[in-house]
Amino acid sequence: MTIQAIIPLVIMGGAFLLIAIVAHTTGQGNLDHIKSKTVGDGQHGTARWATKKEIQQTFKHIPFRPEAWRKGKDLPTDQGLVLGCVGGGPDIGSLWVTLFKQRKKAPERPAVQALVDTDDIHCLMIGASGIGKTAFFLYSNLEYACACGMSFLALDTKGDLARNYGTIASRYYGYQVAVIDLRNPTRSDGYNLLTLINHYMDICREDSENLAARAKAEKYAKILSKTIVNPDGDASQYGQNAFFYDAAEGLLTAVILLLAEYLPPDKKTGTEQRHIVSVFKLVQDLLAPSRSAKGKNGFQVLMNKLPDTHKARWFAGAALNSADQAMMSVMSTVLSRLNAFLDSELEQVLCFDSAINAESFASRKSAIFLILPEEDPSKNF
């Protein structure tokens, strides 16, 4: 190649190098240098980056010090979500010693401050695999929640959250921890869906005048029935079949209340017999024709033995006052909804009392880790 051909290439290479140096030194093209202002008159949208002043006003800057928090020192009091951080950076002290080969006092690393949003907000984290959604974002929020004393429910598909942060929450922050493992139910803590209903019904059995306890038992029974029969919260989507689902909801509430009231734990062993599997078995048994009353099934006979003022009889009124075929359809609807809980492994979870119930979750520092296998849709009930 001749000199005449090389000179233009050298000039072009120098020009590109000069452009690269200018772009690097001026910061053009860096996301940090995108202007925090809208374009035009909003015809392309009004979204923009927040300014430093707005960030300072919107988020609370709280020193993020897990080492001190786990020793019970400098615990934060502002509850919220950790959405970012400022400070930190490389270890300046180690770099100082490496460069200058002397043990003089080096500049300290800037303290990490968490940007905490203390408002009542929801946050959606979206990112590709491996960018740190769990390790950098979720773990930071779990640590901060433990330090603040916030109760939390963590959903997991593999069990990493329970293994990594269950022990930390219990050992260092004094949390009551429950792990509901639907991937390995035999290793899971218990989760009896009727725990609160049984608790308040036991109080009623000891003090029949305690109206508040009975009202709470009925409230939690209605909530459970609504969750099982109409998980979407509205039966109108079923069209002409809405009656059967509404009646099934009332019938299930009645059976749950009867079970909680008249089937106390075994006095000798203390074994709890009131759980969702017992509800299924009772409905199935009551579906059979009665031997004592011709033309009636077991459920109708049982309801006739209750006083007229008993709430269980009221809840089941829609089913009791319908035609025999319609009532059979209502009871079959209840059984079909309870089919999801029939599993020998799941019974190890559902037939034992809960380590944490809804009320203790709200009143004490609690952490519930729910492990849901995404490859097994039968566990999504």
Regions found by a protein language model. Give the residues of each.
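Basic- and hydrophobic-enriched, low-structure N-terminal and domain-boundary segments
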Residues: 1-131, 135-143, 148, 186, ...
